[in-house]
């Protein structure tokens, strides 16, 4: 596809949601300097300017279909940041896994009254539940189990998390 339209940003976001890995743009040019903070605050390419320079919240979600149970479920992450130069702390990131039967459309990523990202306490489906954790290592473990991989520390869990680190750049 055309350069600079967001393909790698989407891949980075999905990878972060599913693996908790904050090393962005591993799939492209490792010298790009892209970061989670830069993506959350919409850093302008090649400039030190941000479209969202102040406090901001970003959600990333992925919906899965369980072919054995014949139902969907969602894995999502919420990142809250005070500013692009502030270091993220563990409490600034929350990973969610829905119970069976929940779809992306059932989660209020956006507050319908304000058009802004939903507050943490409002991020829940009208029916059903979400489990959550702020610990990246616990999130990795829960995500691997939800995907049927087993524990993140198992050989298959380690392989799953490694596969997302593989680069696809022509320069490598």
Regions found by a protein language model. Give the residues of each.
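Phosphate-binding glycine-rich loops of NTP-binding sites
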Residues: 1-37
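Short, well-ordered loop/turn elements at secondary-structure boundaries
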Residues: 4, 55-56, 159-160
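Nucleotide-state sensing region of NTPase/ATPase domains
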Residues: 33-153
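Extended heptad-repeat soluble alpha-helical coiled-coil rod/stalk domains used for dimerization
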Residues: 147-157, 161-172
């Amino acid at each position: 596809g055309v350069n600079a339209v967001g393909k790698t940003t989407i891949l980075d976001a999905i990878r972060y949601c599913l693996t908790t890995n904050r090393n962005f743009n591993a799939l492209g040019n490792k010298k790009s300097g892209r970061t989670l903070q830069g993506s959350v605050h919409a850093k302008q390419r090649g400039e030190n300017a941000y479209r969202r320079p102040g406090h901001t919240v970003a959600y990333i979600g992925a919906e899965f279909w369980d072919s054995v149970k014949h139902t969907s479920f969602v894995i999502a992450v919420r990142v809250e940041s005070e500013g692009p130069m502030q270091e993220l702390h563990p409490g600034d990131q929350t990973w969610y896994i829905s119970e069976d039967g929940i779809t992306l459309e059932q989660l209020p990523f956006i507050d319908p009254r304000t058009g802004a990202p939903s507050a943490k306490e409002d991020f829940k489906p009208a029916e059903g539940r979400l489990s959550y954790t702020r610990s990246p290592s616990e999130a990795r473990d829960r995500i691997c189990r939800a995907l049927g991989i087993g524990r993140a520390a198992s050989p298959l869990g380690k392989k799953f998390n490694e596969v997302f680190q593989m680069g696809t750049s022509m320069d490598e």
